[in-house]
C-alpha cells in the first residue's frame, strides 16, 4: 500500500468535484451537452464500465450529499482512522505517563480500515503516515493531539511512535463492518491499552467521526474555528 501514499493521494476527489462544478456551470450557461455520454455503444460510460448495463441511481438527485458530507475537523488523518484518533486522544491522560508499562494496544475496527490503512513496517513519508491506523493511534496516545506537524520526518523520528505501533494488535469486528456497509454507514473504531501489571484502560469506542452529520451540533464550532484559522493566513479577517 505504501507506493500509493504520496502527496497527491488526496487530489482525486477535489479534482473530480471541481470538474463536476465546471460542467454544472457550463450547463447553466447554456452548454448544449452530450446526451449519449452514458448510452453510446462501445465508448459510452455504460458499455465501458458497466458491461452494457444502464447506470442506476439509488436515490433522487438533490441535496443528500451536501447534507451528509463528512468534515475532517478534529484531526488531519485518513477518514477511516478519525474515530480511532478520537479514542486514542481520550485515553492519553491514562497512558502518557505509563508508556514503558504498556504490554499491548488492541484496536478494533471494520474491514475497509483493515484493507486500506492497517500498515506494518516503515512509513517513508507524511502521506504514508496519515494513512496508517497504528501511527495515528500511537500519536494520539502519546501526545494527546494530532496535527499536520505530527507527520513530518522529525516528529516521526520519535522512537516511541514505532515502538508503540509494534505493540498494537488490530482485529475486525464484523458488527462494525456490517454497520459501515449498511444503512448506519458508521465508522466504528475502539482502542484499549493493556499494561504489563495486568491492569488495563477502559475500552473506548467511537462510532461516528465528529465531522459526521449526526454530530453536527458539536462539530460546527470546531469547523468554524478551523475555517477561521486556515483563512486568516491568507486574508485579513475583521
Residues covered by each model-derived region:
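Extracellular interaction modules
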Residues: 1
Amino acid at each position: 500500500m505504501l507506493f500509493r501514499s504520496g502527496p497527491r493521494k488526496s487530489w482525486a476527489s477535489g479534482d473530480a468535484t471541481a470538474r463536476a462544478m465546471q460542467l454544472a456551470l457550463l450547463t447553466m450557461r447554456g452548454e448544449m451537452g452530450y446526451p449519449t455520454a452514458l448510452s453510446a455503444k462501445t465508448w459510452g460510460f455504460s458499455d465501458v464500465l458497466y458491461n452494457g448495463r444502464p447506470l442506476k441511481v439509488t436515490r433522487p438527485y438533490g441535496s443528500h450529499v451536501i447534507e451528509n458530507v463528512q468534515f475532517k475537523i478534529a484531526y488531519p488523518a485518513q477518514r477511516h482512522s478519525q474515530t480511532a484518533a478520537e479514542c486514542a486522544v481520550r485515553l492519553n491522560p491514562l497512558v502518557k505517563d505509563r508508556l514503558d508499562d504498556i504490554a499491548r494496544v488492541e484496536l478494533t475496527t471494520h474491514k475497509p480500515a483493515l484493507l486500506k490503512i492497517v500498515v506494518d513496517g516503515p512509513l517513508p513519508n507524511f502521506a504514508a503516515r496519515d494513512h496508517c491506523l497504528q501511527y495515528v493511534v500511537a500519536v494520539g496516545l502519546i501526545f494527546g493531539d494530532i496535527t499536520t506537524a505530527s507527520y513530518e520526518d522529525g516528529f516521526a523520528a520519535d522512537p516511541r511512535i514505532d515502538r508503540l505501533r509494534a505493540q498494537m494488535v488490530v482485529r475486525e469486528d464484523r458488527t462494525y463492518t456490517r454497520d459501515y456497509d449498511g444503512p448506519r454507514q458508521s465508522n466504528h473504531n475502539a482502542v484499549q491499552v493493556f499494561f504489563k501489571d495486568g491492569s488495563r484502560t477502559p475500552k473506548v469506542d467511537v462510532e461516528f467521526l465528529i465531522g459526521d452529520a449526526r454530530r453536527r451540533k458539536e462539530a460546527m464550532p470546531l469547523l468554524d474555528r478551523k475555517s477561521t484559522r486556515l483563512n486568516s493566513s491568507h486574508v485579513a479577517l475583521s
